[in-house]
Amino acid sequence: MGQHAAELLQSARETMARCLNCKPREILFTSGGSEADNQALLSAAELGRLKGKKHIISTAFEHHAVLHTLEALEKEGFTVTLLDVHEDGMVSAQQVEEAITPETCLVTVMYANNEIGSILPIAEIGEVCREAGVLFHTDAVQAAGHVPIDVEAQHIDCL
């Protein structure tokens, strides 16, 4: 029975990898979106700390799982910059680019907001992050199944 469960898990991992355009070994299953956000942010922050980088960029418009984790990281000495969100719920790649400093270790923004319908320019933000050598996380819970998610093309490091 354990072998069958392992095979099903591997099959699910391969299916998700095809959907997201990543390698199966890059898929980690969690109990849900909040745990995934927490794990991604805490892991990226720890990597940043090891490199002497303790600045994170996000927005005040994020899910509480992200905002609460950012608050906890601030208590650990991280600096968090919350970008202003336009009236339409958008944040531009230019805003992200202007906020990046040599100390920035992570950018985390919501892919889509289900309350107002905004879909952020994830590929452009991801490109800015990739060019700056900054990890990029997006909470895509509300986007999954509605818009294409391609972690390679959109330069997403953590999802």
Show which residues each predicted segment covers.
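Pyridoxal 5′-phosphate
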Residues: M1-L159
